[in-house]
UniProtKB/Swiss-Prot annotation:
Keyword Lipoprotein tagged: no
Cellular localization per UniProt: Cytoplasm
Protein name: GTPase Obg
Keyword Transport: no
Listed SUPFAM superfamilies: Obg GTP-binding protein N-terminal domain, P-loop containing nucleoside triphosphate hydrolases
Single GO biological process annotation from the record: ribosome biogenesis
Binding site for Mg(2+): 173, 193
Predominant location: cytoplasm
Residue ranges of domain OBG-type G in the record: 160-341
Protein's gene: obg
GO molecular function: GTP binding; GTPase activity; magnesium ion binding
Subunit structure, as described in the record: Monomer.
Essential cofactor(s): Mg(2+)
Binding-site positions, GTP: 166-173, 191-195, 213-216, 291-294, 322-324
Organism: Verminephrobacter eiseniae (strain EF01-2)
């Protein structure tokens, strides 16, 4: 799943119902007068921002969406029923544009936000509407108005919850493949990941969060070195950054490619690149994830972890995992979900009431 998901849909609101020509037929009333009712309005097409959705994949298999037309008017002053509305659930962050002109029409930014993307047509008038002093028996009615029909492009700029940082070959792609449904390319050479990947991590049937994997960062990325610069901006809306480090690379014999290069210095260089690129991105919560635990002798793990954390001067949480064998991934996933849930609860809290507008209460 790529960062920007797209889909094209056709929406059609319902046409309005036709008006009715009818006259009263009552005993002893030769000229009962008109009683044809109006047609009902056509159904609207709404879009709602659903915080439980992370992709537009459903719209790739169901392109056309039509609301019901309004009911026709009837005699005895009966109006037609309004057509049934339809509501399309879309992820938060969806941008809706006119497919023909490319003009942005709407943007769903808030959970639960509802917008009308196509309005149903008004119902036609029945002949009772045309009664006047000079026309007591009108035989005129109007058809219903057509509903709006639009071809739309849906573009999702995904709001990932968690972003992965690290040097090329740190094991970011292996991690996202281990804990999510993403299947990025994994190989033993730098910059295997050439474009961002998203993975939806499902903790429970209706509990999930989104992880974003971007190409590895190297020193000078903020000036354009490597591949990561053009994708760093996609991490600016994340709630948490995971700095994934190859723990086995501390043994220079394991990775000849980085022989003679201090992994701690490399980790510090990535942190400095964040700071140069965007101070707000640098200030985000950042957890240290030491990967490739399976390649480190069991007797050396604790000392190696303590030495790395001490030299890096990392103050936040530290996790030790093996993305290949899944060791330690479970506790990390549950800790991430708890952090994401906490942030979501804070976002949903109502703003504090301005004391100037608070009620004074009983005297």
């Amino acid at each position: 799943m790529k960062f920007v998901d797209e889909a094209f849909i056709d929406v059609a609101a319902g046409d309005g119902g036709n008006g009715c020509v009818s006259f009263r037929h009552e005993k002893y009333k030769e000229f009962g007068g008109p009683n044809g009712g109006d047609g009902g309005r056509g159904g609207h097409v709404f879009a709602v921002a659903d915080p439980n959705l992370n992709t537009l994949v459903d719209f790739r298999y169901a392109r056309r969406h039509e609301a019901k037309r309004g009911g026709h008017g009837m005699g005895s002053d009966m109006f037609g029923a309004a057509g049934a509305d339809i509501t399309l659930k879309m992820p938060v962050g969806t941008i809706i544009t006119d497919a023909a002109t490319g003009q942005p029409l709407y943007e769903l930014l808030l959970p639960g936000e509802v917008i009308t993307i196509a309005r149903g047509g008004d119902g036609g008038f029945g002949n009772m509407r045309f009664k006047s002093a000079i026309n007591r028996a009108p035989r005129h009615k109007t058809p219903g108005w057509p509903g709006e029909k639009k071809s739309l492009k849906l573009e999702l700029k995904v709001l990932a919850d968690v972003g992965l940082l690290g040097r090329p070959n740190a094991g970011k792609s292996t991690f996202i493949a281990a804990v999510s449904n993403a299947r990025p390319k994994i190989a033993d050479y730098p910059f295997t990941t050439l474009h961002p990947h998203l993975g939806v991590v499902r903790v429970a049937p209706e509990q999930s969060f989104v992880v974003a994997d971007i190409p590895g960062l190297i020193e000078g990325a903020s000036e354009g070195a490597g591949l990561g610069l053009q994708f760093l901006r996609h991490l600016q809306r994340t709630r948490l950054l995971l700095h994934i480090v190859d723990l086995a690379a501390l043994d220079t014999g394991v990775d000849a490619q980085d022989a003679g290069v201090d992994p701690v210095a490399q980790a510090k260089a990535i942190i400095n690149e964040l700071k140069k690129y965007d101070r707000q991105l640098y200030d985000k919560p950042r957890w240290l994830v030491l990967n490739k635990l399976d390649m480190v002798p069991a007797g050396e793990r604790q000392a190696r972890v303590q030495d790395f954390v001490k030299r890096l001067k990392h103050q936040g949480p530290v996790f030790e995992i093996s993305a290949l064998t899944h060791e330690g991934c479970g506790p990390l996933v549950h800790a991430i979900f708890g952090h994401v849930q906490s942030g979501q609860r804070m976002d949903n809290e109502p703003p504090p009431l301005d004391p100037r507008f608070a009620s004074a209460g009983p005297a």
